[in-house]
Amino acid sequence: MLIINDNNLSGLSLQRVNGTGELSVQFKDGRSRISRLYQEGAAKIRMPQAVTGPLEAILINTSGGLTGGDRLKWDVALDDGASAVITTQACERIYRSGGGEARIATRLKAAKGTRLAWLPQETILFNRSILSRRLDVELEEGAQMLVVEATVFGRLAMGERVVAARFADRWRVRLGGRVIHAEEFRLGPDVGAELQAPAVAGGACAMATVLMVCEQAGRYLETARAIIGEEGGCSLWRVGKASKLVVRLYAPDSYALRRRLCPLVALLNGKAGLPKVWTI
């Protein structure tokens, strides 16, 4: 008989999640198609069948969530003329850490004449979770890009309240080798108190950043502002021949956030619209 108790478990190390997913897309025979696919560990990529339009890829973390010491890496590259919409099967969950941080690293590359939409569903942080998230984007001149990252601190409908957590979010976006957008966002360890500050979130527990880079991003400015309303903001910059549209949204919970984020994504993503998995 094997007896298990705290004494003989204390020396054991827990199995960690490690996942890597890599996808390359090419434009061939009038369609955007897979040119390379690599999957390792908990990272899986599935492509619903599409006859026309951009290639759609759904990213899956088969572990169901991340905690301290877990690692997840995504790498997406588009060759000349290709288009793709990348989303996730479900919200990513970051659970309480027993030590160390969970890490999510994403690298996106888009060649000339491509259109890339990075549209993962929300990342949910639970109490005492620790997350380091990194996004690196390389765009060639003439590439178009739409990026959405939404973060939720606890699920209000489930009675969850995040008091303590750590969250670091780092973005670097380059166009033609030049940095056109950079972010270093950090919260914690007293997240509950920090979110109450008027200069941070004013008591909101859900937030999103939307970034669009294309030649005509300015045409969406006024409509985007109308969708956002008072709880957020929208700005426009010229970056060389292209323009950059940046949107910030905040809301009391994920449901209220989605009520504005979904029509905004549908607007900015053109004919591709909102990913179907967002509505399931």
Curated annotation (Swiss-Prot):
Claim: Cytoplasm is one of the keywords in the record: yes
Transmembrane segments: none
Record keyword DNA-binding present: no
Keywords of this entry: Chaperone, Cytoplasm, Nickel insertion, Virulence
UniProt GO MF annotations: nickel cation binding
Compartment(s) of residence: Cytoplasm
Main location: cytoplasm
Pfam families per the UniProt record, alphabetical: UreD
GO cellular component: cytoplasm
Superkingdom of the source species: Bacteria
Function, as annotated: Required for maturation of urease via the functional incorporation of the urease nickel metallocenter.
Cited HAMAP family: UreD
Subunit and partners: UreD, UreF and UreG form a complex that acts as a GTP-hydrolysis-dependent molecular chaperone, activating the urease apoprotein by helping to assemble the nickel containing metallocenter of UreC. The UreE protein probably delivers the nickel.
Family label: Belongs to the UreD family.
Protein's name in the database: Urease accessory protein UreD 1
Organism whose genome encodes this protein: Brucella abortus (strain 2308)
The organism's taxonomic lineage, starting at the top: Bacteria, Pseudomonadati, Pseudomonadota, Alphaproteobacteria, Hyphomicrobiales
